[in-house]
Amino acid sequence: MKPYTDFEPPPALAVTPAGRRRLAELQKLHSAAGESLLVDEEAAAAGILRIEFSWPLNDGRTIGLRAVYPDTFPRLRPHVFLTCDPSEYPERHCGSEGALCLLGRDTRYWQANMSLAELLDENLAHVLDGTGAEDPQGEPIEYWWNSLGQASGSFVLVDSRWKLSGYDEGTVDVLVNASRTEIGRTIRAAILSVRAGDGSLLGERVAPLPAAVSSTAIRAFPWRRDDQLSLPTGSAEQTVGKVAYGKTYVTCDGADIRLSFTISRTELQHNEHGDAWVCGMAVREHISHSSRRGPRRKDTVPSIVPVFRDGEIDIGYRVPSVASLRGKRIAVVGLGALGSPAAVELARNGCTSLHLMDDDVVEPGNTIRWELGASSWGTKKQDALKRFIEREFPWTSVLAVPHRIGLPNCDPHIPGETDRLNELLDSVDLVVDASAAPGVTYLLGDICRERGLSLISVFASPNLHGGAVVFHHPESGCPVCMAHANETPEGKSGHIPYPNGMNDESTLVQPPGCSELTFTGASFDLKELSLETVRMAVDVLSSPDEWTVSEVRTVNLHNVKRRMPPSWRIDPLERHPDCGCRS
């Protein structure tokens, strides 16, 4: 560190506008900090401004500070740290590593015309006295402990519903999957149960296991409570040593592994407290084998394994509006560019079971607007989606029904069309038709009306200048009523207009090797329709009493001359007097 008065600005700071702005900061700080202002000369040569100084307060106190300016200054704020013991000050404003919260976290609180000197003058005393403004959010210590281990690709899964207050120690039964990767030792694990010191059961996992935790190796490891556990500080070895304890190792994939868990009361949300989980790990890698003495081992290496929460309340916490999908079964017919994104979004948002029907194969040409990529080439669409969904969204089970509606069955020994449709629609709560085939839509309308099921149909115009998402209540307008509403018997427009381009088939193409003409359109336009389908499904299942009349939502995406932002209109669809669904 060099005194500011002796500091010669290097070219990295002197020749750029951002560098000159940093130098102006030094002048302002020097006016208050005086001779205490020191500049890291080595960092400055690389264009980094790192400084230390003593800041005088109006009450006579002088506070030692360190500041580092990001490369993105002045658009983003400098980071300021205490050089004294931060435990003397309120922890909500002064982190255990000394970081000061002079402003709220949101970047909007810092403006490019502000200076650190002005900020310290206005806010430092309030921060140190605990009288400054606070962000209305919790300070969970597990987040900071997890950050020490995120580069490893490892995790342990827990459930926020477990209540362990009043207990000091015990054991956890852990399903452990260990492997050696390019980035080091990877541990993927899930706690199956939590027990007190006397063996009594305190909590048990009910969430389905993700595919990444596929091991059958269940091991018992210790847990203990430490409500005085602080944020991680100091050297990595000292820090991890606080939580990496225990004596029992298990052998996994060429290494001896020891896990230990520390539970600490923490602020999970603003002024709401609960238990934080921290996982310490020690690994002894096997480096060679001896016929007499067994494997030789490297020294133990302690580390942190991030703890993540994947219980039912944890998965749905960020989006409470999709709670209606839990416990529901939804059938999706047609898994092309409209149906595949809808199926994945329904799974992502918590649908318990999907029944998927298609009989097409994913080809390379599909990939430009299909939901999955090259790893699915050559796979039946329903099978590819089943594998993907059950691997990535383990709370959703998938029934894949291979069938193309309308094909005759010439073999009495295999299930026929009626059998396949019964399998598809068994116990479902809602049907989504993404077949883009009017005949199939009419058939599903008939079947859903007979079964008392609601149907959502989605389709796009051949040139993708528009499309529609239609809700059909079993006692309101059906797909045939929709056809009557679009066009009169004389060929004139009905009271519900077609989407733009609906009757323009001039842009249909037949790619080489494809047996059918197909529409031209991009995934980013098609997803407008797929996502509206999911929104409608969530709304219908959330408030079924409000959805007693069929409804047509028509979107236009193109005005012939150019693409435009989606423009929606909504029309009720009553039963048409000329439709047989009235009888």
Curated annotation (Swiss-Prot):
Record keywords: Plasmid
In Gene Ontology terms, what is a biological process of this protein? cyclic threonylcarbamoyladenosine biosynthetic process
Q: Which GO terms describe its molecular function?
A: tRNA threonylcarbamoyladenosine dehydratase; ubiquitin-like modifier activating enzyme activity
Q: Which Pfam families match?
A: ThiF
List the InterPro entries. Answer: ThiF/MoeB/HesA, ThiF_NAD_FAD-bd, Ubiquitin-activating_enz
Superkingdom of origin:
Bacteria
Asked if the keyword Transmembrane belongs to this entry, the reply reads no
Q: Which PANTHER family match?
A: THIF PROTEIN, TRNA THREONYLCARBAMOYLADENOSINE DEHYDRATASE
The protein's name in its UniProt record? Uncharacterized protein y4qC
